[in-house]
Amino acid sequence: KNMITGAAQMDGAILVVSAADGPMPQTREHILLAKRVGVPNIVVFLNKQDMVDDDELLELVELEVRELLTEYGFDGDSIPIVAGSALQAVDAMIAKGTTKQSENEWVDKIHKLMAEVDAFIPTPERIIDKPFLMAIEDVFSITGRGTVATGRIERGKVKVGEIEIVGIRDNRQSIVTGVEMFRKLLDEGMAGDNVGVLLRGIQREDLERGMVLAKSRSITPHTKFESEVYVLKK
């Protein structure tokens, strides 16, 4: 459930597969879910390379991953695959306190992975010229400040001012008193940003996942609609 919630907002993903063990049952499940919720691009990291002495085994695991990606509708032949060891890279950075390139082969592999992410996963165009809309992912309270709804802005912009809470219960008006991202106060949040929206006069129990925040009177909730449902079996 948590994987679906997060994946539904992704512009791309890094699929981590153990080079020592190869694709596991959950690997197949994660690829399927990524495809179903519309993750457009994937880059693969073959972790634990330090535990694999046989280059042919590493090539076999890479081939398995490519075939699996192709099976579920991704372009398995062109997806970048980088092998490395996250643990070795972290140990090297802790020991030397550096993340510079060309100083450690394992750290270099992480740099290579992120370079592939930058090259292969484009930044999509954000819809900022339409009315604000954000699905609520989580809700929490800040003592002395009020209730915060978090989520990824689907479209438009949000800043201090009037807002409407839509879904599940009757529509309700509120006032945005602050917008934060990574504990920094913003003048405004825009499409694509993961933000926390501080709401005036709203209790934590008034909000839940499935509701949306929107520009006042810009959307209408419906109780009848057509949808496509994917059911996963164990």
Curated annotation (Swiss-Prot):
<dbReference type="InterPro" id="IPR000795">
    <property type="entry name" value="T_Tr_GTP-bd_dom"/>
</dbReference>
<keyword id="KW-0342">GTP-binding</keyword>
<dbReference type="GO" id="GO:0003924">
    <property type="term" value="F:GTPase activity"/>
</dbReference>
<dbReference type="InterPro" id="IPR004161">
    <property type="entry name" value="EFTu-like_2"/>
</dbReference>
<dbReference type="GO" id="GO:0005525">
    <property type="term" value="F:GTP binding"/>
</dbReference>
<dbReference type="InterPro" id="IPR027417">
    <property type="entry name" value="P-loop_NTPase"/>
</dbReference>
<keyword id="KW-0547">Nucleotide-binding</keyword>
<dbReference type="GO" id="GO:0003746">
    <property type="term" value="F:translation elongation factor activity"/>
</dbReference>
<comment type="subunit">
    <text>Monomer.</text>
</comment>
<keyword id="KW-0378">Hydrolase</keyword>
<comment type="similarity">
    <text>Belongs to the TRAFAC class translation factor GTPase superfamily. Classic translation factor GTPase family. EF-Tu/EF-1A subfamily.</text>
</comment>
<dbReference type="InterPro" id="IPR050055">
    <property type="entry name" value="EF-Tu_GTPase"/>
</dbReference>
<feature type="domain" description="tr-type G">
    <location>
        <begin position="1"/>
        <end position="125"/>
    </location>
</feature>
<keyword id="KW-0963">Cytoplasm</keyword>
<feature type="binding site">
    <location>
        <begin position="47"/>
        <end position="50"/>
    </location>
    <ligand>
        <name>GTP</name>
    </ligand>
</feature>
<dbReference type="GO" id="GO:0005829">
    <property type="term" value="C:cytosol"/>
</dbReference>
<dbReference type="InterPro" id="IPR009000">
    <property type="entry name" value="Transl_B-barrel_sf"/>
</dbReference>
<keyword id="KW-0251">Elongation factor</keyword>
<dbReference type="Pfam" id="PF03144">
    <property type="entry name" value="GTP_EFTU_D2"/>
</dbReference>
<comment type="function">
    <text>GTP hydrolase that promotes the GTP-dependent binding of aminoacyl-tRNA to the A-site of ribosomes during protein biosynthesis.</text>
</comment>
<dbReference type="InterPro" id="IPR033720">
    <property type="entry name" value="EFTU_2"/>
</dbReference>
<protein>
    <recommendedName>
        <fullName>Elongation factor Tu</fullName>
        <ecNumber>3.6.5.3</ecNumber>
    </recommendedName>
</protein>
<keyword id="KW-0648">Protein biosynthesis</keyword>
<dbReference type="Pfam" id="PF00009">
    <property type="entry name" value="GTP_EFTU"/>
</dbReference>
